[in-house]
C-alpha cells in the first residue's frame, strides 16, 4: 500500500499522508462494518469503498389499500385566516361574515403578529388636527342608509369624539409627543380607521365600538374639556345612546404612536420578549428603521418575525417640519 501511495503521489508528502489516511479509514470501515462497507482494489491503482444501500425487495402493492386520509384534526392557522378573509366563499353568507365586526381577525394569547400601517395611516396617527379626516368620514357616511338600524344615529359627534375628543389623546405619564410637541399625542387606532372610505360599513361599526370603549365611562365635563363645532347637547345624546352598544371585545391602549414605538425600541434594546402586535410602518416609514433589529419566534404559529426599531428623533423632526403637531 505504501509503495502504491508513493507512486500515485509522485513524492509529495502531503498527498501521500492523505492517501494513506484515506485508505486506512476505508479499511477500518470495511473491517468494523463488513455487512455495510466493502473495500475493492481496482486495476487502476485505486480503491473503491462500496456501501450496501440497496433497498429491500418489497412488492409495491403488498399492503392494504390506503383509506381516504383524514385531515380533520390538522391545525392550519394560515388557511383558517385565509378563509376568514375571503368569507368562506362568495354570496350572501360570505358577505355577512366579511362585514360583521364580530368576525374581525383575533389573535391568540401570547401570539406575536404585525400591526401594519401604510404611509397615510401612520401619518394620520401622528397628526393632531384631524378635521380633514373627519370631513372625509362624514362625507362617506352622508347616506342615511349607512346608519340604518345603528345607534347612535348621529355620525358627526360620534366621529368627532373618536378623533378629537378629550379622551382620544395619550395618557402616558411621560408622553413623548407632549414632551416634544407640547400636547399629548393622538391615541393610536388600528390602521383601517384612518381610511374611512376603504370599507364604510366596517369603519362605522368599529367607530361605534372604539368610541364606546374610550367614552363609555368618561367622567369629564364636555364644555370645559373641548370645543366641538356643534352643540354639546349632541355629544351628550350620543353618549347616552352608546350605553346599549356592546364593546366588551374591544380594546385600544391609551397611548400614542410615538409611545408605542418607544416601547418597541426599549424591548429590542433590552433584548426582551415582545408580546402582541409589532408596529410596522411601511412606505416612507421604512426610512426611519434603524440597524438595531430583533428576531423572535411566535409560540402559536412557529413563525420567526423581525421586530424593527425606529429613529424617534427623526420622526419627531418630521412631525414638526410638516406641521402635524398643529391644532
Curated annotation (Swiss-Prot):
GO terms for cellular component: host cell nucleus. The keyword Protease does not apply. Keywords: Host nucleus. Disruption phenotype: Deletion results in reduced immediate early and early lytic gene expression and blocked late gene expression, while viral DNA replication seems not affected. It is found in: Host nucleus. It holds the Pfam family Herpes_UL95. Participates in the expression of late viral mRNAs in part by interacting with ORF24. Expressed before viral DNA replication, assembles at the viral pre-replication complexes (pre-RCs) and thus serves as a hub for recruiting a viral transcription complex to ORF24 to promote late viral gene expression. Also plays a regulatory role in the viral life cycle by regulating host transcriptional regulators HIF1A and EPAS1. Interacts with ORF24; this interaction may serve as a core scaffold for the assembly of the viral transcription initiation complex. Interacts with ORF66. Interacts with ORF18. Interacts with ORF23. Interacts with ORF31. Interacts with host EPAS1; this interaction stabilizes host EPAS1, ensuring its transcriptional activity. Belongs to the herpesviridae UL95 family. This is Protein UL95 homolog.
